[in-house]
Every structure is written in C-alpha cells, then in structure tokens.
Amino acid sequence: MGIMMMVNWGLEARKWQLLVRPLEYVPFKRAFMAVFSGVSVSVSTPNRVGEYGGRVLYLANRHKLKAIAATIVGSYSQLIVTIVMGLCGMIFYINNFEIIKSSQYFAPNFWEKILLGVLIMICVLIILLYFRLQIIVAIFDKVPILRKAKIFVLIIARYSAKDLRKLLLLSTLRYMVFSAQYLILLYALGVTVVWWQGFLMISTIYLVMAIVPTIAIAELGLRGQVSLYFLGLLSKNMAGIIAATVGLWLINLVLPAVIGCILLLGVKIFKDK
C-alpha cells in the first residue's frame, strides 16, 4: 500500500512538473516534495484548495501566482477523469438498484436518470472547455474586473493539445492506482465484491466526494457514509467497508500530509537561513 501511495502521488508530481515547465524547470524530486507539501496545507481548506499554495512555495516568487493557474489545470484534468468514471458508475447504479420507488407519476429511478443526464451534459461541456482553455483567457480579457489578473492565467493558453492529452493520461493512471488501492483494502478486510462492480461503485463514491464541498480533515465522516451507502449495496460487511475507507484515508491523505509538514518545516528553515 505504501508503494502504491508513492506511485499515486508520484504521478501527480509528474503532472505538476509538466504543468510548471513553461515557467521554470522543476526536478522530479522537488515536484514530489511540492506535492506532499501541498497535501499538508490542503487538509484544513475546503475541497483542498490550499494545495495550490503549498506547492508554489517551491517556485521562484515571480512564478507563484502563475503556477496556481497551472496547478488548477492539473486539477481540472483529474476532475474530468473523476466525472467520466463516475458517470460509468452512476449508469451501473441506476440500472441495477431502484432506490426511489416508482409511482404513478414517475418511472423507476426517474430523478437519478435526470441527475445522470445533467452530469453527462456538464461532462461534455467541461471536456470541450478543457481543450479550449483560451476561452478562459478571453474571459479575463473581456471582463474589466478580471483584466488585471490576465497576466497570471496566460500560461493556461500555452498548453498544446498533446500536453493536455498527456495530463489526462497521467490523471487516468493515477485514478486507476487509488481505485485499485481501495479494492485491495476491501478484499484484504473481507469485503467480498465482484471486482468490476466494486470499481464502478468506488467511481460513484469519488464522483459524489468531488461534487460535495468538504474540508479534508472532516472528510472522513462523509466519505464513510457515502461508502457505506454505495458499497453496502454490494456487501453487508459494513465494518470492512468502514475499515477500508479509513485505511485509504490514512494512507493517501494523512501520511502524505505528515510528510508534507516535515518538508514545509525544511522550506521555512531554508528561507530563514
């Protein structure tokens, strides 16, 4: 599990290394340190937005604000993968589980299907925007209140379609790694599920967690409830589901955050010197 955690965040470090390359060269080791530091800062901020601030500490001062925009592109690519995979999970969920009973007015899972349709439209729009990031720069140029900040977002228009596809590939690989971690923990703790069904339900869990705003340090409770709801449809081993969820949270978030805190202390000492 520790090795998979390192692979998970190593892929994220590679993404960030590619993203900031137009600004300055960052060795992979330094990118890895920046990612861990970002995790440590993010645990106390809504939806981990503090992650951006933790990473840019490793860059030159003149590049920090521009690097935030670059880092957001990386999060954007990960969100696309989360939504696409989550939609696959939602389709499986809707087709196999009638949670809201049908009535004379609504067909089975009517509202779930409405939600699925909305999510598909949103997914199509964000993918189109992802490959047309120049639109965001144009918005900053057209809106007076945003015009002064345009210089900080120009970097997102410098990524080629090839760069963006590479980011999506790395995001997909990372998604597969932390989904596999979850499945392995479930099996290790006696939660018996068909692997592909478990993967689809895990994808649905990640989709819900991406949509619902939360703070990382308080995320565990919500993650536990969502996991019990979806994985509980496949297995009655509730204790195993909770244990796997807590284990994944500790391995993929708490441990990197602790490492990041130590690294941030080193950055501060270096600056003091």
Show the residue positions of the predicted features:
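Transmembrane alpha-helix interface/packing and boundary motifs in multi-pass membrane proteins
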Residues: V41-V43, S203-L222
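Predominantly cytoplasmic-facing regulatory/coupling regions of multi-pass membrane proteins
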Residues: M1-V35, F92-V212, I251-K273
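Membrane-embedded alpha-helical segments of transport systems
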Residues: S40-T45, A69-I91, V246-V258
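Extended non-transmembrane interhelical loops and adjacent amphipathic helices
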Residues: F32-Y58
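Re-entrant/interfacial helical elements at transmembrane boundaries that shape
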Residues: G50-A60, I215-G232
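Membrane-interface alpha-helices at helix entry/exit sites of multi-pass transporters
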Residues: K29-R30, R48, R62-Y76, S235-G247
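Short amphipathic alpha-helical coupling elements at transmembrane boundaries
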Residues: R21-E24, G54-Y58, A69, I151-R158, ...
